[in-house]
Amino acid sequence: MSRLAKKPIPYPENVKVNYVEKEHKIVVEGPKGKLELNVHPDIKVTVNQQERWIKLDRPTDRSFHKAIHGTMAALVKNMIKGVTEGFTEVLEIHGLGYRAQLKGNVLELHLGKSHPDIYPIPPDVKIEVKGNEIHIHGIDKQRVGQVAAEIRSFRKPDPYKGKGIRYKGEQLKLKPGKAVGKK
């Protein structure tokens, strides 16, 4: 990752990037919103407003600095992508009678329990329900993934029948049931 981090990270014209040196904070603002990132104090940040790029530099080639350098570069790239395009995660609901519905700013999940599971939707994330799919949209990749994981945790896929909530495209390896032997 650290080789990719050595290159300057370009950003489009509709994105504004600022670095607040006192607070070690990068602020990225774009058409979809604004994101902030606290940068590790060892990482030096250079923002070129004219040529529209941001560069991160590490003080040494120690493995810790290489790791944190690559991580910070990946986070900045995700911030730029988030404020321009946004991120989407899709969950699928499998199971007879399993369904989801939106009620205001709350997601109500009926997952075969005696009561519906209620998930309050965070203000920085947008959720849509289309049939048996839940679409989660947002500008912060980490937040979108966290919300998807929290919703999935209400009913993870069953290893025998595959019932539950899963990510779109997630492959399940179903276990065989109990084998009835001869007597």
Swiss-Prot record:
One of its GO terms (molecular function) is rRNA binding. Keywords: Ribonucleoprotein, Ribosomal protein, RNA-binding, rRNA-binding. The keyword Ribosomal protein applies. GO terms for cellular component: cytosolic large ribosomal subunit. Part of the 50S ribosomal subunit. Belongs to the universal ribosomal protein uL6 family. This is Large ribosomal subunit protein uL6. The gene is rplF.
